[in-house]
């Protein structure tokens, strides 16, 4: 099944649909362990973000274009029923923005390691050192996208190694950096109209504590945990919890969805 030239991988059976959205520098394969655990009771829908496939031409998608693709994916895979979003990294960013604009389409949200990243509270907790780390790696990847070619690919892979990214380096390239170029270089029209995420439905937020910087603020996590039906879980991992602790993450997701 295709939506806007985006190939959807659909597995599993069940009355509810889980839409899985990855981030940098991953593909739909990031969610393999989660699909294995969830497909017995849920219909799992996943795809590689537009522009992240190495076979696709290097380009920046507009913010509105990406949200429209998400809307079509949700409506065409779960007609008339709300979905559960399972999100990581840039998938969190785009999924959160989508959920705030289309609350009628989203029943629950599982967010992995990205919360209110970039908010005033998050920036205050990061401090100068943390903000510098974020600025350096994000600008590096934005420039890698802009440069492209072998040099840009090399820059992207070097950053992935530096960040101890578990993704197969053969799949990583400069083309995946366009969300950073959207943020810092205005590519695709930039990120106009972005709102700080405040969940309007039950949410499970999971984050790894072993990272140079946090992508959420403590107060935001406290507010999420205080919402009815929501939960916050800390893992002794880095950014890629689903790779480092797949069994524990799967158990947390299944338990929360069943509650």
Language-model segments: residues:
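C-terminal alpha-helix
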Residues: 73-77, 252-259
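A short loop-to-beta-strand scaffold at the N-terminal edge of the catalytic core in hydrolase folds
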Residues: 2-11
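Flexible "cap/lid" subdomain of the alpha/beta-hydrolase fold that forms the substrate-access gate
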Residues: 45, 52-86, 93-229, 237
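The conserved beta1-alpha1 loop
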Residues: 19-23, 88, 207-208
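Catalytic histidine-centered segment of alpha/beta-hydrolase-like enzymes
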Residues: 237-246, 250
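Conserved HGGG/HGGXW glycine-rich cap/lid loop of the alpha/beta-hydrolase fold
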Residues: 11-54
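Residue-level signal for the nucleotide or nucleotide-sugar donor/cofactor binding architecture
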Residues: 26, 61, 65, 244
């Amino acid at each position: 099944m295709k939506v806007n030239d985006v190939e959807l991988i659909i597995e599993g059976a069940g009355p509810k649909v889980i839409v899985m959205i990855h981030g940098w520098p991953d593909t739909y394969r990031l969610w393999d362990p989660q699909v294995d655990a969830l497909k017995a009771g849920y219909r799992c829908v996943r795809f590689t973000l537009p522009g992240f496939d190495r076979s696709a031409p290097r380009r920046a998608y507009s913010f509105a274009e990406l949200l429209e693709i998400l809307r079509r994916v949700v409506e065409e895979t779960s007609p008339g029923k709300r979905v559960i979003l399972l999100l990581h990294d840039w998938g969190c960013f785009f999924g959160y923005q989508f959920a705030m604009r289309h609350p009628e389409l989203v029943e629950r949200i599982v967010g992995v390691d990205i919360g209110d990243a970039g908010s005033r509270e998050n920036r205050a907790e990061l401090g100068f050192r943390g903000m510098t780390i974020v600025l350096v790696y994000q600008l590096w990847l934005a420039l890698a996208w802009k440069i492209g070619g072998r040099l840009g690919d090399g820059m992207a892979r070097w950053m992935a190694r530096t960040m101890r990214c578990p993704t197969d380096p053969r799949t990583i390239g400069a083309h995946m950096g366009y969300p950073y170029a959207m943020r810092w270089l205005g590519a695709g029209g930039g990120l106009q109209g972005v709102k700080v995420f405040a969940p309007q439905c039950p949410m499970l937020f999971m984050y790894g504590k072993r990272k140079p910087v946090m992508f959420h603020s403590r107060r935001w996590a406290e507010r999420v945990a205080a919402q009815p039906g929501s939960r916050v879980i800390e893992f002794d991992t880095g950014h890629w919890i689903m790779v480092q602790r797949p069994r524990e993450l799967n158990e947390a997701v299944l338990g929360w969805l069943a509650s």
